[in-house]
Amino acid sequence: MKSLNVLLIFSILSLVGCSSPSPNIQPRAKFGLLFPDSIGIATMESAYRTAPRYVPGASQIGMFPQIALRRLEFFDEQTCSVTEPMRAYGSMQARDLNALTDFCLRQQVASKVEPTKGQAMQQSIDVFFATDRKELRDGAILGFGNERGSFSVGLVQVSIPREHKLGAVERWSSSTLWPRRSEDGFEILSIRLQGQQSFFQQTKEQLQNSKERRAFIFVHGYNVSFADAALRTAQLALDLDPEALPVFFSWPSQGAMQAYPVDSQNAEWTEANLQKFLETFGSTSGAESIVVIAHSMGSRPAMRALAKVLDKRRDLRSKFKELVLAAPDIDADVFVRDLVPAYVALRMPVTLYASAKDKALQLSKQFNGSPRAGDANPRPPVIAGIETVDATDIDTDFLGHAYVAETRALLTDVTLLIKNRLRATDRPGLLKVDAGAGLSFWRFKK
């Protein structure tokens, strides 16, 4: 069977070369003189990659570019705007709000990795997980396989690459001549199983430092291993909302392109476990603002499980703020007839991202004999009570199925949705489209 899901591996961006101005000029002045005529995102990219050169001692400790840019005080993270010093030196004149917000996302990563005085540079992130996959052991826990297993929770420590491109899950390449280093890419450093009491005690402790106590729960799709899900969640944590608690639920996908029928059965089987986890997380984790992000086939159990939780536990409705459906591989008729009405009745916000270029969902349509909710051909599903975003015009991989996690415009839009709580009508990158009968959907501006 042809692949229904391909996750491309992106290479790490190379550093931009430039000559250093006179050493008697102050760091910010030095930095500004390098880019006197540039405008927009190209300047921001150059500034991002070269900033460590102009912070004393940065190269000796391997300072992250995000941190160096903060030290130079060229960017205001709170307002996502350029500071006056940077404007004064002509380094950047960003006029595009989406590009500016995108760059702001990079800077917020620094809050995760900048050490306090006397600490070593943090180069990893802890990602919380729940899974019903079978454990892989050799005495100690090695990971989780593709078979059904008992329910487990714990933490995965994932390395953070020094140079991270928005939307990419960079991985170390075996073809390189350089020795392997964890900071070269996303990599699982350790897996720690925990009891539920210890697990939720740790979520509470981490959320205590968060003003809004935000968390997101990622439910992956078809053809995804446990390791793939962990690395993708770490990438989403960096790119979407570094201040939110990153959590993923991993069901027993076979991690194989030809195993679509088995994955489909397991996605149905996992629903009860996911429902139990969502309910327990909502009531026990300490999070006050929870977003569920479901991709592809993972949207099936996620939609049903969350609706049951919210119907059963009225006290949790205020905590679950949004359900984001990214390219959902759900029968479109079932979606409209059975699933959406439940969320409309619950007054639960739902955002659907769909694309007419999603070849994976087109293949799924052929396999299942029915159109899919994430397929925007000839147009996306437009239903009263949910917000639909047509991402057809966004450049994606050749299957166009992982676009929400991998493309700049999509990541920016999702961030404005889940972190800034902006509805589609208020997000600057979207254009409202009249669908008739008093209904509307949104497209990305060209």
Language-model features: where?
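Bacterial N-terminal signal peptides
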Residues: 7-15
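Short substrate-entry loop that stabilizes the transition state in hydrolases
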Residues: 225-229
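Bacterial N-terminal signal peptides that target proteins for export
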Residues: 1-7
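The conserved beta1-alpha1 loop
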Residues: 217-221, 327
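Post-signal/leader-peptide non-cytosolic segments of secretory proteins
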Residues: 32-103
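Gly/Ala-rich beta-loop-alpha elbow adjacent to hydrolase catalytic centers
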Residues: 294, 298, 302
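Lipolytic serine-hydrolase domain surface
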Residues: 102-210, 230-240, 244-289, 306-322, ...
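Bacterial Sec signal peptide processing site at the extreme N-terminus
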Residues: 18-35
